[in-house]
Each structure stands twice: as C-alpha cells, then as structure tokens.
Amino acid sequence: MKLKSIMSQCQFIIGATSIKSLPDFSIPEVALAGRSNVGKSSLINAITNNRKNARISSKPGCTRQINFYLINKGLMVLVDLPGYGYSKADRATVNSYICLMEYYLLNRKNLSKVVLLIDAKVGFKEIDLDFIRWLEVHQILYQLVLTKIDRVQSNVLDVIVSDVQNFNLNFIIYPIINVSSKCKQGIEELIYEIAQCIKK
C-alpha cells in the first residue's frame, strides 16, 4: 500500500468531551498534541490530503475536545488532542479538557505514540518542556515534529534539534521530523512514521 493512500480515507468519528464519551477502539491510535495554534488541524488536513477533515481557526485554543478520525476504514485512528497553553475559554473549561486529555493519555492501552508538534518559529516554550517532562514521567512514547518550517531558516532548525539532543530523554522516538503543511514538506515522512503503528 502506498504511503499517501494509507491516510487518504479519513472519517471523523466523534469529538469526545468527557471520559464516558471516549470511543472504545482496539486498533492502534496515534495522538497529535501541541501548544495552541501550533498547526495540528492544518497538519491533519495535509497528511490526509483533505482540507475539510479538521476545522482550521485563526484563534488559538479552539479545540476543546478530543477528536477521533478513523483512517482507511479501520486501519488505525488519528487522535487530535486539545492544544495546551493559551485559550479564550474560562479556567473551568480549560481544566476540564486538560483533565480529559491526561486521562486519555494515561489510560489508552492502544495508544501507539504521541506526535508532539513544536512551532519551529518560536522553538520550545516552557509549557512544551513541561509536557515533555510529563510524558517522560509517565513513560509515554512520543515523537517530535517541528511545524511551519517554511517560515524559518535551516540553521534555526539545527539549533532546535541540538537542544533536544542535550535533553535527558528516554521515551522519545527518533527521527525528529520537519514539516510544512503549506508547502507539503516532510508530510510523506510523517505519514511513514505514523504508519509504523500499523506494523506493530
């Protein structure tokens, strides 16, 4: 099966807003996480080659539920987690979906890995490092993806990658992938890395 065809059939299943509404799948899941406005929705549309799959907003913090997408009629599930960081929602709402996200990550037995998106324009923020530390503490596998690389020079990317190598990380999956949803750069490599969960 060709890489692009793996992700070409993408069906939105449910937006879970509570623990009870989380769907029960036995197939592999890959979750996309990242700071608010890091480009998760754009990336989902890029890897599925459909601009309509995930709603894109210019306002950060709009995803307030866990969105589940069935890939290729049940080959796997792509999961869009709420963005952490800035949000216009009230504190109670933010705490609610953060708790839901933590519950999902800690209890999902069919979760293959978390794809953690980092905005290459700004690099690592403290909140990104806090999330990485949280994943490490709870021994959750994750892979880093640098987004919006069309807006930065290659030497900036080199610095970010160098920073990662200086961290003491035990549950990171390499390689670090550089992507641009706008230019479609790195998309095929990312699809390949996501598809590895199918082979396990």
From Swiss-Prot:
Pfam families, A to Z: MMR_HSR1
GO molecular function, one term: metal ion binding
Gene3D superfamilies: P-loop containing nucleotide triphosphate hydrolases
InterPro entries in UniProt: G_ENGB_dom, GTP-bd, GTP-bd_ribosome_bio_YsxC, P-loop_NTPase
Domain EngB-type G: 26-200
PROSITE patterns noted in UniProt: G_ENGB (PS51706)
The keyword GTP-binding is assigned to this record: yes
Taxonomy, superkingdom: Bacteria
Job of this protein: Necessary for normal cell division and for the maintenance of normal septation.
Name this protein carries in UniProt: Probable GTP-binding protein EngB
Chain's gene name: engB
